[in-house]
Each structure stands twice: as structure tokens, then as C-alpha cells.
A protein has these predicted regions:
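Acidic-glycine-rich active-site phosphate/pyrophosphate-binding loop
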Residues: 1-4, 38-52, 242-261, 293-311, ...
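Glycine/charged-rich beta-loop-alpha catalytic/anionic-binding loops adjacent to active sites
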Residues: 2-11, 51-59, 257-268, 308-318, ...
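Conserved phosphate/anionic-ligand binding catalytic regions in large, soluble enzymes, centered on
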Residues: 12-28, 264-281, 323-326
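A structural signal for small-residue-enriched, beta-sheet-centric alpha/beta enzyme cores
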Residues: 13-17, 48-55, 138-142, 147-163, ...
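Early transmembrane hairpin of solute transport permeases
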Residues: 23-126
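Hydrophobic alpha-helical bundle architecture
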Residues: 36, 286-299, 303, 309-375, ...
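Flexible, glycine/charged-enriched surface loops at secondary-structure junctions
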Residues: 36-43, 84-89, 111-112, 197-203, ...
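Signature of multi-pass transmembrane helix bundles
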Residues: 105-261, 425-437
Length: 437
């Protein structure tokens, strides 16, 4: 089940996953249009949930100077092949990219807010020659639930759950939340897993692919160039080049490249490339800094990604809170393990993370995501260093509880119910009593 969860929640993507989901939906609609008899796309209408619009508004389109969901929709509709899923824009020829850009500049692409209960919802309607194609993606970034040609459904799984609507190997958030605990993840990664022989290819890919995008981010001035600037600060003596700063440099550089639209793939975690980078690269950086062998590094990276997946299962695919805080909590656990920590120390590390960076808001996917990631990675290294010494935020403080699972549930509640004072106070006043032996 652990490998199935990893394969379900980790996948290749190019660029930000929200524009990717828009492009995929548009590609499905465009393909339906062509089957209905339409030729050259004349107009595109996108209706999406607020969270999708927020995260797609300022994100760069891979391999172009464009940004935003209108370009993603046009590119997907004009030249996208839905078989490529979240990498759909990677395979669109330059001529069709230019055709799509012309549609946007001519005002032929409209973006509207969809009044729907789902946080992840994209609907695209494409028209040409009196024909229409329509597609809907919902709940998961690649979960296509409806495709229509001239109003006639050729695929309709709107009343099915995400696993039924998409790949049969998809594991639902409810299944993940029920199966994964910090204890079960720890036992699997440290005792049951054989990293060199078990089929954890997605973890190996995450290390390789996300290292590539981090190196890309250090090679050029992408976005705010947080990784390169941290590196420069070290060379100038403004910062110390230590384990923590090294992890910050490597993780933020990957996000620099991704948010700027570098045409380089990433292995995402829970639908987010930045979370994939954040859950993987600080752990890889720490392992290499400490000269840790590959087997232990793979255990640590698996631990990190599974902890992030466990949190996101209740946190929500898209949220008002920054997903880097979730992924960095996973990274902190992986780092604590590499520093010699056991299960108790990993639990202390989680308590330190929730007691520190909880509440960082998500105000869209954009260049300064790399800045937030560097902050979260700094916190992760600090939390791990404290945790391996048994130092932890106490259950008398804030939303931290005596049991790490309750703490993570409180963390998720802030994501799903908002971060108002009333919600925070309610969590503080209604903590679980410690169990007695």
C-alpha cells in the first residue's frame, strides 16, 4: 500500500501544476472539438475554482515568456495532447504556441470564476466552425470527469470518486488518511523498506529529476533567483555556508526555475511541484552534506514524502495555507532521521514545525514561492536539530498537542476551516487529554 500511495501522489509535471491542470483540461476540450469537426480554435472559455485561479494567475508557462491560466488554456486547446497529462505544454510545437498566444492577445480567451464547492475545479469550453468541445477536471489535477463533443458526453464520471474517475491506482485522500500514521510511516521506512530493491522508482526519480531542476535554478537568473542570491550571500560572507544554508539554496533554486517556467520536469508531491521539491531536495542536500549512503538517503526521502502525503490528505489538495509548510515538515522528519533521530525525535521535530511556521498563507503560485520555501527549509533544519536532542514545543503551547497525530489534525483543521481567531482559539481550548498508561 505504501508504494501504491507513493505512485498515486507523486508524478512528473512541468511548470506549475495549476496551469498544467488548466492546459490538460483545455487539451481534452480541444481534442473533443476536433473530433466534432472543428478545426482552428476560435475561442476558449475557462471556468475555474478560486484556488485554481489564484495559483495559476502568475505562474510562468514552461519554455515561454508567458504567464497565467489564459495562456495555459489557449496552449492546451490549440496544440495539447491530453496523453501527456501535467506535462502537456512540454509537447506543443512553437507554431501552435504562437497561435495560442495570438488568441489571448486578441481577447478570445476568457477566464471566469466557477461557483462550485470543489477547491480544485477546471472547466474549459473550446469553439470553432460552429462546433464545441468541453471538458472538466475536478478534485485531482489529472482527474478528468467530463468530456463533451457538441454537447454530447463521450466521458461522464462526474458522480464517481477520484479513483473511479481517473486511474484505478489512484488512492483517495480518505484512504490515505485512514492508512498512514507517523508511526506506520516510520516503521515502513526504517524497517520494512528495502530501498535498493523495492519498487520505489518514483522516489529515485524524485531525487534525480528534482536535482536537475535545482541545478537549472542555480545556472540562470530565474525569477527572484533566491537560490543564487543565497549562494552569493555565502560567497560575500553575509551568510555561513553550512548544512542549513546549503539545503535552502538547493531547494529554493528548484522553485526559482519552476515558477519562472523553465522547461524542466519536476516530480510533484500531492499535486504540487514545489512541494515535491521541498519534500525531496533538503533531504538530498543534507544526505550529501553528511556523506550519507544511498540506502539511508532513499529511506529519508521516502519518509519525508510520505509524511507530506499524510498531512496533505487532510490538509486539502489546494488550501489557503502555504503547501511548503507541509512539505517542509516532511523534509524536517527526513533530516532528523539523517541526523540520527529515532521515532520519538521525529515526533518532536513535527511538533517543532507545527509550532513554528503554521499559518503561512498561500497567495498564489509565483516567483516568491521560492522565498517561502527557503524560509520553510530553514525552519525544517532548525526543527530537526532541536528534535534530535529531544527538544520540542510543549502541548501547553498553541495548537500543539501531546500526540503528534492530534497536532497534525489541528494543522489540517486550520487549512480546511480557515485561520480566523475563532478557529485557532477553539483548537486551543479543546485539546485532547493526554492518555494515561
Amino acid at each position: 500500500m505504501f508504494v501504491r500511495i507513493l505512485n498515486s501522489e507523486m508524478e512528473l509535471a512541468t511548470g506549475c501544476t495549476e496551469p498544467g491542470a488548466v492546459a490538460l483540461t483545455a487539451a481534452e476540450a480541444g481534442a473533443a472539438l476536433r473530433k466534432a469537426g472543428g478545426t482552428r480554435v476560435e475561442a476558449v472559455t475557462v471556468r475555474a475554482s478560486i484556488n485554481i485561479i489564484k495559483n495559476a494567475m502568475s505562474a510562468g508557462i514552461p519554455g515561454t515568456s508567458y504567464q497565467g491560466m489564459d495562456y495555459a488554456a489557449a496552449i492546451g486547446a490549440v496544440g495539447g495532447d491530453p496523453v501527456h497529462l501535467l506535462e502537456v505544454m512540454n509537447y506543443v510545437p512553437r507554431e501552435q504556441m504562437e497561435e495560442a498566444a495570438a488568441l489571448v492577445k486578441a481577447g478570445k480567451v476568457k477566464v471566469e470564476v466557477a461557483q462550485v464547492p470543489q477547491k480544485l475545479y477546471v472547466e474549459v469550453v473550446v469553439t470553432a466552425d460552429g462546433h464545441t468541445g468541453r471538458a472538466v477536471v475536478r478534485d485531482l489535477h489529472t482527474n478528468v470527469v467530463l468530456v463533451e463533443q457538441d454537447g454530447v458526453a463521450t466521458l461522464d464520471k462526474q458522480h464517481a470518486g477520484p479513483a473511479a474517475a481517473g486511474d484505478s491506482d489512484v488512492v483517495t485522500p480518505e484512504q490515505i488518511a485512514e492508512f498512514l500514521t507517523v508511526r506506520s510511516i516510520w516503521d515502513y521506512c526504517t524497517e520494512e523498506l528495502d530501498p535498493l530493491h523495492d519498487p520505489i522508482d518514483i522516489i529515485r526519480s524524485a531525487v534525480q529529476v528534482n536535482t536537475t531542476i535545482s541545478n537549472e535554478g542555480l545556472s540562470k537568473e530565474y525569477g527572484l533567483a533566491i537560490g543564487r542570491n543565497l549562494e552569493l550571500n555565502c560567497r560575500k560572507g553575509l551568510m555561513t555556508r553550512d548544512l542549513t544554508t546549503n539545503a535552502m539554496v538547493i531547494a529554493s533554486a528548484g522553485a526559482d526555475a519552476r515558477m519562472a517556467g523553465a522547461p524542466v520536469s519536476v516530480v510533484a508531491n500531492s499535486g504540487s511541484g514545489n512541494q515535491g521539491i521541498t519534500a525531496t531536495m533538503p533531504v538530498v542536500a543534507t544526505a550529501r552534506w553528511l556523506d550519507i549512503d544511498e540506502e539511508k538517503m532513499l529511506r529519508a526521502v521516502t519518509l519525508s514524502n510520505l509524511i507530506a502525503i499524510r498531512i496533505k490528505a487532510k490538509f486539502g489538495r489546494l488550501s489557503n495555507l502555504c503547501g511548503a509548510t507541509v512539505a517542509a515538515t516532511g523534509a524536517a522528519c527526513g533530516i532528523a532521521y539523517l541526523l540520527g533521530g529515532g521515532y520519538h525525535e521525529v515526533c518532536c521535530t513535527i511538533q517543532n514545525m507545527v509550532g513554528n511556521i503554521t499559518g503561512m498563507v498561500c497567495d498564489g503560485a509565483k516567483a516568491d514561492c521560492a522565498l517561502k520555501i527557503s524560509t520553510c527549509v530553514n525552519a525544517a533544519c532548525q526543527a530537526a536539530a532541536m528534535g534530535v536532542r529531544g527538544v520540542r514545543v510543549q502541548s501547553t503551547d498553541g495548537i500543539v498537542e501531546h500526540n503528534v497525530e492530534y497536532t497534525l489534525d489541528n494543522f489540517a483543521t486550520l487549512s480546511t476551516n480557515g485561520t480566523s481567531d475563532s478557529v485557532i482559539l477553539d483548537l486551543m481550548l479543546n485539546k485532547h487529554l493526554p492518555e494515561t498508561d
